Amino acid sequence: MNPSSPPSSRSVPIAACFDLAQDYDRAARVQARTATALADRIAKRYASSAPPARILELGCGTGALTRKLSALFPNAEITAIDLSPGMIARAREAVPGVIYYVMDAEHPELTGPFDLICSSFCIQWFNDRAAAFRRLAHLLTPGGRLEVTTLAQGSFAQWREACEAEGLPCGFPDYPALSQLSADYPTSLQGIWEGETKRDPVGTARRFLQDLRTIGATTPREGSRALTSTQLRRVMQHFDRMTNEMDYRIAYGSAVRTRGVFVTGTDTGIGKTLVSAIVTKALDATYWKPFQTGLSDEAGDTASVTTLAELPSSRVIPPAYAFLAPLSPQDAAALEGREVDPTALTLPESDRTLVVEGAGGLMVPLNSDTLLVDWAATLDLPVILVCRSGLGTINHTLLSIEALRQRNMAIAGVVMSGTPNPANRAAIAHFGRVPVLAEIPHLDEVTPQHITRQAEILRDALHRAGF
């Protein structure tokens, strides 16, 4: 960890602007109201659950949100970072007992995991939100929360209208729509964005611009050209004739780091267990196969994954149901006079990512009422779909993808098993609109060493998905 990490090239002028913002709190009216609203939302998220033990705040500024976090969670270890040394100094004075670093929030060099990462009015300064969200997901504990606000499409509408009316360009950044913000979440973050308009009584154009300078928010859109003094005067006069208020469109993002992944397949016997071992190794995860059949013929998938991924017993959760016959869970249970009750099953507690392996394909019946896919949908885990690489795989894989999407299940990607087939891979990626995470070739011998090598390859693809 570097407590004073070098900022990116675009961050340098941003930090300089905020360092000069001596009267920030007086002018940051909307920022203060938004920090209060975000704190209220965070309090509601934790009203019926355990409070976060470790919190990371991005872009803490002078400590408006930091103060509220400290009051909400007095026993938490709070780390707050900001690009501006001046802002950090003021926050440290206002809210003692917090760990402060001068650091680029888009590239935090910190050791996780954190239970809560939050930020108010920081991520609009990021160069690459999607990449930043992936990095933040890596810092969250499984089940941890991301709670942020940012400016969204529709902000400063009155100023933009005045510029357009005068036929002049607006130098303000183009803020994203809620749909774009949602698309920026990696698969490992599942959540929503909600919008709210806050109207600020700025009075006049001059006061509005002065307040922006006061809070240091003067970095223009990249590539924009500054207005001449005459042009700026025209826009200000038009604004004053039109209104004395300014709209801030606020986006509230709330997401949870998924607790793991669900590994399933287009059929039985296609390599789900092999892929589960590889994924478990790649993510340093805990493994669980809730429904195990066929124990009359073999030791079972739990034993195989334990050996191949070299797992200690603490990272292996025994099956909830284990049956002798190599049949569907419904039929295997019936032969033993039993019945599977999936409603009684919830995800086991684990401080690691969980890899949950299914039984057979998606449409395997668990009992007379429930298919495997319907139970899996209740877990809120993104899916890794294992398919064959050869003839027939396009149809089977696309049908499985369609079944997952009908149930609003997130798909982390597809892993193909067998002799690599570039045409089939391209068709599945194109028509399925999913990433192909890896192609696992046929292995004459499967050993822990083979699993380790394949895990190193798959780890990069999973990392790009936020795991």
State each model region's role.
Residues 54-108:
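Class I SAM-dependent methyltransferase SAM/SAH-binding core
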Residues 192-258:
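Conserved Class I S-adenosyl-L-methionine
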Residues 401-467:
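C-terminal lobe/tail of nucleotide-utilizing enzymes
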Residues 106-117:
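A short acidic, Gly/Pro-enriched loop at the edge of an enzyme's catalytic core
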Residues 130-142:
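A short glycine-rich, Lys/Arg-flanked "PGG" loop and its adjoining helix->strand segment in the class I
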Residues 274-337:
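N-terminal phosphate/diphosphate-binding loop that engages ATP/GTP or pyrophosphate donors
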Residues 29-51:
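Conserved alpha-helix/loop element of class I SAM-dependent methyltransferases that forms part
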Residues 145-205, 218-226:
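Conserved catalytic/acceptor-binding region of the Class I
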